[in-house]
UniProtKB/Swiss-Prot annotation:
It comes from Brassica napus (Rape). InterPro entries: FADS-2_CS, Fatty_acid_desaturase-2, Ferritin-like_SF, RNR-like. Its EC number is 1.14.19.2. Pathway: Lipid metabolism; fatty acid metabolism. It catalyses: octadecanoyl-[ACP] + 2 reduced [2Fe-2S]-[ferredoxin] + O2 + 2 H(+) = (9Z)-octadecenoyl-[ACP] + 2 oxidized [2Fe-2S]-[ferredoxin] + 2 H2O. Keywords: Chloroplast, Fatty acid biosynthesis, Fatty acid metabolism, Iron, Lipid biosynthesis, Lipid metabolism, Metal-binding, Oxidoreductase, Plastid, Transit peptide. SUPFAM superfamilies: Ferritin-like (SSF47240). This is Stearoyl-[acyl-carrier-protein] 9-desaturase, seed specific, chloroplastic. One of its GO terms (molecular function) is metal ion binding. The lineage of its organism: Eukaryota, Viridiplantae, Streptophyta, Embryophyta, Tracheophyta.
Length: 399
């Protein structure tokens, strides 16, 4: 890899493997869901004999369930009206929303073939490493069924029927509908570009959705909304940087595509951060402890279980390219933490319990600590090797 980071903060896209913090008062007793623990390497025959009819290529072996005390659910019931007033306005009317076709060649027009030719000519000017990052971002967006599933694991705010009229459920469905356009648009662009192996990309998407994700939010909406606040900010940054680099390479249409997606992510970030702001008003102690808990566990990116059927380190390798290009970096991770802590006024919280004060102290000292570690890592960094990516027909890209 191009960079190795201290365990305090993994590469921004990389799943961190840190020990869980001690049980805190904002949690109820934990229920652990255990799968098979680590074991010595087995032969391929032994592995095959142990497999079920279908086994995801990436499995999470330890998960914590329902860590929020049941009485805290009342907080989210009490926020229902506020959610309607403060959350739903951040959704856009479908009739006024952009659609993928607004940015792509029109297949019904006489000039369709010429438009595709122009798109492909612009795409030829983009380097392979840029396409690796753009494909990785698209695959992340295409795993949307997983993210709706994740939101519907959260106690007190899930869509109980699939068409629930509660504000929480309406938001989740409409947020999903807005996000759905992102993967559609990038997928169609990449298909038309002629620069990528669509079958390998489609396999990666299927593998990823089948594997799911483990954000370690524990069915707990405190943790869940902190996670989504961070994630929406991260995707805003990432798509914004791919937009900037597309412009630098002369593809103004692709820059517009990525910039439009980034604007959506920014709007969604605003909605999720408002939920956490309200939680800090109602339950500052529980919320600051939850924030510290998520940061101790580290924010794992949604596509951390990515696999293409070949590369066991695909996600790490994709992350290294994103880090090297400056699309999403350890510095961005620290910047997002600093932004959220400032937005939520963590430093100025008062009246906290002993545990809340410890969480506050930890959060206030974390950003400079991450920055110091990143600076040391960059000073020690060596040039990464070149490896093939199946997404771009096994052409080699430097990590």
């Amino acid at each position: 890899m191009a960079l190795k980071f201290n365990p305090l903060v993994s590469q921004p896209y990389k799943l961190a493997s840190s020990a869980r913090p001690p049980v805190s008062t904002f949690r109820s007793p934990k229920f652990l869901c255990l799968a098979s623990s680590s074991s010595p390497a087995l032969s391929s025959k032994e592995v095959e004999s142990l497999k079920k009819p279908f086994t995801p290529p990436r499995e999470v072996h330890l998960q914590v369930l329902h860590s929020m005390p049941p009485q805290k659910i009342e907080i989210f019931k009490s926020m229902e009206d506020r959610a309607e007033q403060n959350l739903l306005p951040h959704l856009k009317d479908v009739e006024k929303s952009w659609q993928p076709q607004d940015f792509l060649p029109d297949p019904a027009s006489d000039g369709f073939e010429d438009q595709v030719k122009e798109l492909r000519e612009r795409a030829r000017e983009l380097p392979d490493d840029y396409f690796v990052v753009l494909v990785g971002d698209m695959i992340t967006e295409e795993a949307l069924p997983t993210y709706q599933t994740m939101l519907n694991t959260l106690d007190g705010v899930r869509d109980e029927t699939g068409a629930s009229p509660t504000s929480w459920a309406v938001w989740t469905r409409a947020w999903t509908a807005e996000e759905n356009r992102h993967g559609d648009l990038l997928n169609k662009y990449l298909y038309l570009s002629g620069r990528v192996d669509m079958r390998q990309i489609e396999k990666t998407i299927q593998y990823l959705i089948g594997s799911g994700m483990d954000p370690r939010t524990e069915n707990n909406p405190y943790l869940g909304f902190i996670y989504t606040s961070f994630q929406e900010r991260a995707t805003f940054v990432s798509h914004g940087n791919t937009a900037r680099q597309a412009k630098e390479h002369g593809d103004l249409k692709l820059a517009q595509i990525c910039g439009t997606i980034a604007a959506d992510e920014k709007r969604h970030e605003t909605a999720y951060t408002k939920i956490v702001e309200k939680l800090l008003e109602i339950d500052p102690d529980g919320t600051v402890v939850a924030f510290a808990d998520m940061m101790r566990k580290k924010i794992s990116m949604p596509a951390h279980l990515m696999y293409d059927g070949r590369d066991d380190n695909l996600f790490d390798n994709f992350s290294s390219v994103a880090q090297r290009l400056g699309v999403y970096t350890a510095k961005d991770y620290a910047d997002i933490l600093e932004f959220l802590a400032g937005r939520w006024r963590i430093e100025s919280l008062t009246g906290l319990s002993g545990e809340g004060n410890k969480a506050q102290e930890y959060l206030c000292g974390l950003t400079p600590r991450i920055r110091r570690l990143d600076e040391r890592a960059q000073a020690r960094a060596k040039k990464g090797p070149k490896i093939p990516f199946s997404w771009i027909h096994d052409r080699e890209v430097q990590l």
